[in-house]
């Protein structure tokens, strides 16, 4: 270090104001004011000083490492949070909304801010040389989230999502923590499932925190802080608590502080959100503290082993008491609980890697599945937009049908009031059912739309004219005159083709027609040329849960429902040598959904007949039955498929 005057010094090429403890740009006009003596200024100009503009030119990031431990001993450092982007840049956390690149890592370090008038702001931080030890109180940290770790994701009626991390129950929709022993939560989940989840995951950490005399609770998993978002900087301090016999035992508490003095990060919880029995007049906040320090504080005389022991000892006592209280509540409520639990509760596993990609909750299971599969962000957004359109179409159609039933009671306000209770409940239930149908069908429908099905057989794609009348294409021999496929072993070919033409056919990898006898259902194919040159007929089939076509049921097989599942499909018939007929169809074409219009007409006639002929009580019961039918899973599932076909055919026509 070279001392220029009583205030300025040069340290490893950096001009430092030792009074204000900050670096100074030697090109700044204030340098001359601080060095009125010409000799001092001349001595400074002879030094090989760092050119600040090179810092920005040499780096695309705002965080720049400097290999000078001596420099950072004489300047002030503040704690700042940064994002490491997938293109290698490091930027300040607060400008994340402007990003176009994925955040790879979140990091925090103590650094010093430098302002360059033409180049903007950069932050310098200490970068170690070989065999150098880090400065006391200066080290980098980042939230260390294991991308493969999985967590229980609890869904209540699809639209409410919770996650459990180290015993803390986090309501993802609002990024807010919940106590497990909460009356509203218990009624929402239902007593039976509430008790089961408690025994499986025991998410009572927030209940414990509110019951502690200490105002802090350690957490190891950084994902909790990442999801909660807003963090505060804290430090531990010793206090003397009043004890028995005049003794004053040593006690540790957490206190908010500045970034320069912080040793840990934490999430602050206001005591105003705690139950009245847990509120403390002396402390406004309690803190969930990240167990790993953000700095190695070698100056502090605090013993962290004592701090952890304090929490562990106190928490174990509180945990046993809370478990006993909750068990008692479960026993009491179980004896008097006769209500049927109607809410739809599901528990799934979700990885932290997937959670890190989600900016807003709730998120559908379809989106979670696509994220887990590593699908592109733009593709996922398109799927979500398609899902919104399908949901809108289904809701509009179902609501219209329900409104027609509701209008039946316009002349009887008392009966309409009774019906409205069932009506509004049905609306809530069918929206949940639609979400479940989306999870069951949407991805399968998209795969069908994208023509991603694999054919039942891999046929040859060669195209070659054997004669002006016969064409080989898609593994078939096509008779262009009769516009149909013909069996390569057909005896008629002996007179219709010459010897060398038949020899040519024998050398080709064509479909063996005897193989078709193995199939009872129509066969899906990817064979554009075949369907182009062959005559097709319209035939009714049944579409199964796998979206493939099946033959109509016989008397021995009545498990299908023909009116609901029947579709009309274009297909190519082929006559086998045992005089049975097999059907080939293009699996990239969505068949016509035949049952929709006839079914709607039937329901409409039934509705008019019902409203004209029934007594009021019977009319009410029949209206409830019809409403339940319209909001049933099978009916909504059929409407969802029809809506998809409507969108698909609309895009095709465009």
UniProtKB/Swiss-Prot annotation:
SUPFAM superfamilies: ORC1-binding domain
Region (Sufficient for interaction with SIR4): 322-654
Stored InterPro entries: ORC1-binding_dom, Sir1_ORC-binding
Result of changing residue 513 to R: Abolishes interaction with ORC1 and SIR4
Record-level GO cellular component terms: chromatin silencing complex; chromosome, centromeric region
Pfam families, A to Z: Sir1 (PF11603)
GO biological process: heterochromatin formation; silent mating-type cassette heterochromatin formation
Effect listed in the UniProt record for changing residue 466 to G: Abolishes interaction with ORC1
Consequence of substituting residue 470 to S: Abolishes interaction with ORC1 and SIR4
Keyword tags: Centromere, Chromosome, Nucleus, Repressor, Transcription, Transcription regulation
Main location: nucleus
Subunit structure: Interacts (via OIR domain) with ORC1 (via BAH domain). Interacts with SIR4. Interacts with CAC1.
Record function comment: Involved in the establishment, but not the maintenance, of heterochromatic silencing at the cryptic mating-type loci HMR and HML. Is recruited by interacting with the ORC1 subunit of the origin recognition complex (ORC), which binds to HML-I or HMR-E silencers, DNA elements that direct the formation of silent chromatin at the mating-type loci. Establishes transcriptional silencing by recruiting the three other SIR proteins, SIR2, SIR3, and SIR4, that function directly in silenced chromatin and establish repression. Also found in centromeric chromatin.
Stated name of the protein: Regulatory protein SIR1
Organism: Saccharomyces cerevisiae (strain ATCC 204508 / S288c) (Baker's yeast)
Gene giving rise to this polypeptide: SIR1
């Amino acid at each position: 270090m070279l001392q220029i005057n009583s205030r300025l010094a040069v340290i490893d090429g950096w001009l430092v104001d030792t009074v204000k403890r900050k670096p100074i740009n030697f090109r700044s006009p204030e340098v001359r004011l601080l060095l009125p003596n010409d000799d001092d200024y001349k001595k400074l100009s002879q030094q090989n000083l760092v050119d600040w503009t090179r810092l920005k030119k040499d780096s695309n990031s705002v965080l720049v490492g400097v290999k000078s431990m001596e420099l950072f001993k004489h300047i002030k450092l503040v704690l700042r949070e940064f994002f490491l982007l997938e293109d290698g840049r490091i930027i300040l956390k607060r400008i994340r909304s402007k990003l176009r690149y994925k955040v790879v890592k979140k990091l925090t370090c103590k650094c010093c801010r430098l302002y360059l008038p033409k180049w903007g702001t950069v932050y310098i931080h200490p970068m170690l040389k070989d065999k150098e030890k880090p400065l006391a109180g200066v080290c980098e940290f980042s939230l260390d989230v294991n991308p493969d770790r999985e967590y229980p994701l609890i869904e209540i009626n699809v639209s409410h999502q919770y996650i459990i991390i180290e015993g803390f129950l986090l309501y993802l929709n609002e990024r807010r923590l919940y106590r497990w022993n909460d009356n509203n939560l218990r009624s929402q989940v239902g007593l039976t499932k509430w008790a089961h989840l408690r025994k499986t995951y025991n998410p009572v950490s927030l209940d414990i925190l509110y019951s502690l005399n200490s105002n802090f609770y350690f957490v190891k998993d950084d994902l909790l802080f990442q999801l909660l978002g807003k963090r505060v900087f804290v430090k531990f301090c010793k206090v003397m608590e009043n004890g028995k016999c005049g003794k004053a035992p040593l006690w540790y508490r957490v206190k908010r502080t500045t970034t320069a003095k912080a040793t840990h990060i934490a999430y602050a919880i206001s005591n105003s959100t705690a139950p009245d029995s847990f509120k403390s007049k002396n402390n406004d906040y309690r803190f969930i503290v990240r167990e790993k320090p953000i700095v190695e504080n070698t100056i502090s005389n605090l013993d962290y082993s004592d701090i952890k022991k304090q929490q562990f000892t106190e928490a174990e006592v509180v945990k046993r008491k809370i478990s006993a209280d909750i068990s008692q509540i479960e026993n009491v409520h179980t004896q008097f609980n006769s209500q049927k639990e109607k809410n739809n509760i599901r528990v799934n596993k979700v990885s932290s890697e997937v959670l890190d990609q989600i900016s807003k909750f709730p998120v559908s299971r379809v989106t979670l599945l696509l994220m887990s599969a590593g699908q592109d962000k733009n593709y996922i957004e398109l799927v979500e937009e398609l899902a919104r359109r399908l949901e809108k179409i289904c809701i509009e159609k179902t609501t219209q049908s329900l409104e027609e039933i509701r209008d039946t009671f316009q002349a009887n306000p008392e009966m309409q009031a009774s019906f409205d209770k069932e009506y509004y409940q049905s609306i809530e239930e069918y929206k949940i059912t639609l979400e479940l149908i989306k999870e069951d069908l949407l991805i399968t429908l998209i795969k069908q739309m994208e023509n991603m099905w694999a054919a039942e057989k891999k046929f040859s794609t060669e195209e070659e004219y054997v004669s002006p009348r016969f064409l080989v294409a898609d593994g078939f021999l096509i008779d262009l005159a009769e516009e149909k496929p013909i069996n390569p072993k057909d005896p008629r070919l002996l007179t219709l083709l010459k010897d060398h033409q038949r020899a040519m056919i024998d050398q080709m990898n064509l479909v063996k027609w005897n193989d078709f006898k193995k199939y009872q259902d129509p066969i899906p194919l990817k064979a554009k040329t075949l369907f182009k040159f062959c005559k097709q007929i319209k035939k009714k089939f049944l579409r199964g849960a796998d979206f493939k076509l099946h033959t109509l049921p016989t008397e021995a097989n009545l498990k299908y429902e023909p009116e609901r599942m029947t579709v009309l499909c274009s297909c190519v018939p082929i006559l086998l040598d045992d005089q049975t007929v097999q059907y080939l169809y293009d699996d990239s074409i969505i068949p016509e959904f035949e049952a929709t219009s006839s079914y709607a007409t039937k329901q409409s006639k039934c509705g008019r007949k019902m409203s004209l002929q029934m007594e009021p009580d019977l009319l009410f019961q029949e209206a409830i039955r019809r409403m339940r039918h319209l909001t049933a899973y099978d009916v909504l599932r059929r409407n969802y498929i029809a809506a998809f076909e409507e969108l698909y055919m609309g895009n095709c026509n465009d």
